[in-house]
A protein has these predicted regions:
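Transmembrane helix-loop junctions and nearby membrane-interface residues
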Residues: 47-50, 54-57, 151, 222-225
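Membrane-interfacial loop-to-transmembrane alpha-helix junctions, especially the N-terminal start
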Residues: 35-38, 180, 239
Length: 330
């Protein structure tokens, strides 16, 4: 598949439908609880599948993947922070909050990438699922540390700064007990320890309806992403450019790690690139809102959900797969 055919995947088309419905002011809406239920199902399904595959995988390779997931989660926010400061469009607090989103991961983008790979018949390793489960928290920690550093510099310079909400221990607990992280890790453990026969009995639930539920999830995400269009004027052109270019740079770093450091196949390398390129819009926003009250939520929400998520779904995933094919397919 190439060119326009890369976009002719039901999941991507449903995202476009949701986006269009919002633009033309349709009354199409999802009940909040239904949207949450779709997210829960997808996390459980991908966790069980990943755990089942992990049970057959090599432990050393899994630990290696875990290590590089932490490295990505720690380094990408720092890169994003200094790039944002260089734009001179945001202060240190907003730079820290935005950077935390870009060091974390988007389960929705990851699931869309899986749908894309399945649609073109590309196999992938189970290890990126482990990486997905652990990359949320390191980025949140780095975001908090960058904000604390900025706050300390402001106080040292005699400037007044708002007191960050919540202590570090509380925020770290929030990060590690976040519902999406607990669900994903818990489902992975279940998929790992359950007997193959018992996993087979729930395959209609975790496999057969997966793609259909993903289409509904992305329909709702299209509606939500289009809602952020109105905030673009507040974000500014340079920050919109950051929301497009940062994922591309991070995705290339992900390709280098997926193939060069982990030795993954084209599919696995693509998924590592997607993990590196995605920006969180579920776990990180509440953590930043609580811990970095100085930051403007409309900036990091508009960038992660209104710019980067649509870019990755429509253009980024095919791009990262193309690069992975050129690198890992040699």
């Amino acid at each position: 598949m190439s060119g326009l055919s890369n976009l002719l995947v039901p999941a991507v088309l449903f995202f476009a439908l949701g986006f269009l419905a919002r633009v033309i002011r349709s009354d199409l809406r999802f009940p909040p609880e239904m949207a949450k239920a779709l997210s829960i199902y997808l996390l459980v399904a991908i966790g069980i599948h990943g755990g089942y595959e992990l049970a057959k995988a090599d432990l050393l390779t899994a630990l290696h993947a875990l290590l590089w997931a932490v490295v990505l989660g720690l380094t990408l926010p720092v890169l994003g922070y200094f790039v944002l400061l260089a734009t001179r469009r945001v202060d240190g607090f907003n730079a820290a909050a935005i950077a935390a989103h870009y060091g974390s991961v988007s389960a929705g983008t990851f699931l869309t990438a899986i749908a894309y790979l399945k649609s073109i018949g590309v196999e992938y390793e189970s290890y990126p699922v482990i990486m997905l489960a652990v990359m949320e928290s390191p980025a949140i920690v780095i975001g908090l540390l960058l904000a604390a550093w900025t706050r300390g510099r402001a106080r040292a310079g005699g400037a007044t700064a708002a007191t960050g909400g919540g202590n570090l221990g509380h925020i770290l607990r929030e990060a590690f007990t976040n519902g999406s992280v607990v669900l994903l890790i818990g489902a992975m453990v279940i998929g790992t320890v359950a007997t193959p026969a018992s996993i087979d009995s729930i395959k209609p639930f975790v496999n057969d309806i997966f793609m259909g539920v993903l289409c509904l999830f992305l329909l709702e995400m299209g509606l939500e992403a289009a809602r952020r269009i109105e905030d673009f004027r507040r974000v500014g052109l340079l920050l919109v450019a950051f929301g497009v270019l940062m994922p591309v740079v991070s995705g290339l770093i992900g390709v280098a790690i997926g193939h060069g450091m982990l030795g993954f196949s084209i599919g696995g390398t693509t998924l590592v690139a997607v993990l590196a390129a995605s920006a969180s819009y579920i776990a990180v926003p509440p953590a930043m809102r609580l811990a970095v009250p100085e930051a403007n939520p409309s900036l990091y929400l508009t960038l992660s959900l209104g710019v980067t998520f649509p870019f990755n779904v429509v253009f980024g995933i095919p791009l990262y797969h193309w690069v992975a094919t050129r690198v890992a397919g040699v």
